[in-house]
A protein has these predicted regions:
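Divalent cation-coordinating acidic motifs and surrounding scaffolds
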Residues: 20-321
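N-terminal signal peptide c-region/cleavage motif recognized by signal peptidases
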Residues: 14-17
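Conserved beta-strand positions that form and line the central face of beta-propeller blades
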Residues: 101, 551, 578
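Bacterial N-terminal signal peptides that target proteins for export
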Residues: 1-7
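Alpha-helical segments with a strong preference for the paired helices of cellulosomal dockerin domains
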Residues: 72-77, 552-573, 581-601
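Feature for long, exposed domains in two main contexts
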Residues: 319-546
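Acidic glycine-/aspartate-rich tracts in secreted/extracellular proteins
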Residues: 30, 66-68, 80, 107-108, ...
């Protein structure tokens, strides 16, 4: 039945993640006596769980009560995006099931040579795995999973204690300061049990209960309980309601010391446990596990009671900060800061998913001084102004030494040799040999001479290798009939930009045409970039190409407009309109105008 049901659930999991942030889930699979579809949906819900502020794909699944014959089935439920770690079954399947671990292979690489089986009594074994953390040189997490002997009574308690002793003895063989997560169905009934005390008492190999060593019995501690999510037995799933804390994730002190790899405060929880179902089924009435989304909580609770008779445990862990830096200000403008960027490159979903990066920065060589920065994960890079004199142009060099004081970031300081140049600002000018910011360009053309083109040069005055290029950002469109046809280049160094203009002399009467053209410019896109405006005035005279006496308006043609001018002066004595020179503007002048009708020749 289990394999047949899997046909509908194999596609639930994505194959990869884009984060280094760690989420660990431990879950007693109840020897797969539950519903396969429900199990797959519960595991997906573990990745989607944002009840404590954020969701992140599960990095590591640890299962108890796993039958070797169903490993392929379990792999399908977990999803193809996870790799199965070393699996061993020393007849554990006959004694309550073996242990299995699946991990995201984009985050970890298993060191299989470090796998161990540890006898824990009652025919069962704990497994120890070692995962090297990708992206962190030399960083490793050890994980233990176990299923200790169940039931009350001093004999069963002693069996559990002996199993814990064997596990703690193994922990003591690991390097000092190792990161260790110990999970499983421990079957501890109280913190007074010898096995629990053996795990948590001070000394070598101690592991810590994230919820503290206080009592977990009774309704006031329901949030801590993990068994059983169902009230009445359902096939192979044991009932009884939610009133026991059998499942644990114990941690080494290195995972709860506030730095580097570390448990994120407040994220240790039983998936779907809203604290309101003491000694009852987790789906009795409403489930408020997801704040403000009761329907979602109810849907999860319905899956939990048919998936297993335990609740999954989830804990989120921060990763160490990652020191990153960049330097792009090898060329800056006079008066600007030359900035060195320091980054926290930890790839996480939320800022608390990685440690804060604390860095001490020392300057030497041609530089001097020191400073320090603190950069939370997902923050913008911190700009550190280098102690460079940028008041004058010139070259510089120096050494920057970065030493992180954040745990587990680096083992040696990072030493960076730098050099750069301070350059002068660009200087727009309409002349090569002088700084000319305001300029009037005069030119004349004969009327009726067609389209006439003309050019104006714009220089970067004084340009050499120690000066910024001149970026021409905008040339104001001139008033018609003057037309701007564009620039030969928008970036001016030693070669000037050619601004191309034209005017159609056939379409306009003789006149003086003037246009004012503010030109916006700036430095290169460098630190200290400045903007400016130069003013160009273009003045074009269109003059008559030919003239005749009767062409009063000077447009090169005798026509109606000239008659109207003559009539307006009828009877007057203006010599310009007295074509026959008899001292009065009259009929004889009109006849002479008509005789000259048409273009002047």
């Amino acid at each position: 039945m289990f394999n047949r049901l899997l046909i509908t659930v194999c596609a639930l999991y994505a194959s990869g993640v884009a984060t280094a942030q760690i989420r660990v889930v431990s879950y007693n699979s109840a020897q797969f006596n539950g519903d396969a579809n429900a199990m797959a949906e519960v595991l997906q819900a573990a990745s989607d769980d944002d009840s404590h502020g954020f969701a992140v794909p599960v990095s590591i699944f640890l299962f108890q009560e796993v039958d070797e014959a169903l490993l392929a089935t379990l792999q399908n439920v977990v999803g193809s995006g996870y790799s199965m770690a070393t699996f061993t079954d020393q007849n554990d399947s006959s004694w309550g099931g073996a242990q299995a671990m699946f991990y995201n292979s984009t985050q970890f690489v298993e060191n299989s040579a470090l796998h161990e089986d540890i006898f824990t009594g009652a025919g069962r074994h704990a497994d120890r795995w070692a995962l090297n953390v990708s992206g962190y040189s030399g960083k490793r997490i050890y994980l233990y999973s176990m299923h200790l002997k169940s039931s009350t009574g001093s004999s069963n308690q002693e069996t559990r204690r002996q199993g814990v002793e064997n596990v703690r003895d193994d922990i003591m063989t690991l390097p000092t300061g190792s990161h260790i997560i110990v999970v499983g169905d421990m079957n501890f009934y109280s913190p007074n049990e010898p096995g629990y005390i053996w795990f948590t008492e001070a000394g070598d190999g101690q592991v810590i209960d994230p919820l503290g060593n206080g009592d977990w019995g009774g309704g006031s501690n329901t949030l801590k309980h993990t068994q059983s999510p169902l009230l009445n037995q359902d096939g192979g799933l044991i009932g009884g309601g939610l009133d026991d804390r059998f499942d644990f994730q114990f941690l080494s002190s290195s995972l709860i010391d506030g730095g580097g790899f570390d448990l994120i405060s407040g994220t240790y929880r039983a998936l779907g446990n809203d604290g309101n179902h003491y000694n009852d089924a987790i789906n009795a009435g409403n489930n408020y596990y997801f704040p403000g989304d009761t329907a979602r909580g109810n849907a999860l609770a319905d899956k939990l009671i048919i998936s297993s008779d335990h609740m999954p445990l989830i804990a989120d862990y921060q990763v160490p900060a990652i020191l990153g830096w960049s330097f792009e200000d090898d060329r800056v403008l006079v008066g600007a800061d030359a900035n060195f960027l320091v980054r926290n490159d930890a790839q996480v979903v939320v800022s608390q998913g990685a440690d804060v990066l604390d860095v001490d920065i020392d300057f030497s060589g041609g530089l001097s001084g020191s400073t320090s920065v603190s950069i939370p994960a997902m923050s913008a890079p911190e700009e550190v102004a280098l102690p460079v004199d940028t008041s004058i142009s010139g070259s510089w060099d120096g050494v920057v030494t970065l030493t992180s004081t954040s745990p587990e970031v680096q083992t040696v300081p990072e030493i960076v040799k730098l050099s750069g140049d301070v350059i002068e600002h660009a200087n727009a000018s309409f002349a090569f040999d002088e700084d000319l910011d305001w300029y009037t360009y005069d030119i004349s053309f004969d009327g009726n001479s067609g389209v006439q083109s003309f050019n104006v040069w714009l220089f970067n005055y004084g340009f050499d290798g120690s000066q910024s290029l001149l970026e021409i950002d905008d040339v104001t469109t001139p008033d018609l009939p003057i037309v701007f046809n564009g620039l030969s280049t928008n970036s001016v160094g030693s070669i000037p930009a050619l601004m191309e203009f034209e005017i159609d002399t056939d379409s306009v009467p003789p006149d003086t045409y003037t246009s004012f053209l503010p030109i916006s410019f700036s430095d290169e896109d460098l630190a200290g970039e400045q903007n400016g405006i130069s003013m160009l005035t273009v003045r074009v005279d269109v003059i008559p190409s030919t003239s005749c006496d009767a062409d009063f308006d000077g447009d090169g043609e005798v026509d109606v407009a000239d008659i109207l001018i003559l009539i307006a002066d009828w009877g007057g004595s203006d010599p310009a309109h007295d074509l026959d020179g008899n001292g009065i503007v009259g009929v004889s002048d009109l006849l002479l105008l008509i005789a000259a009708w048409g273009p002047c020749t």
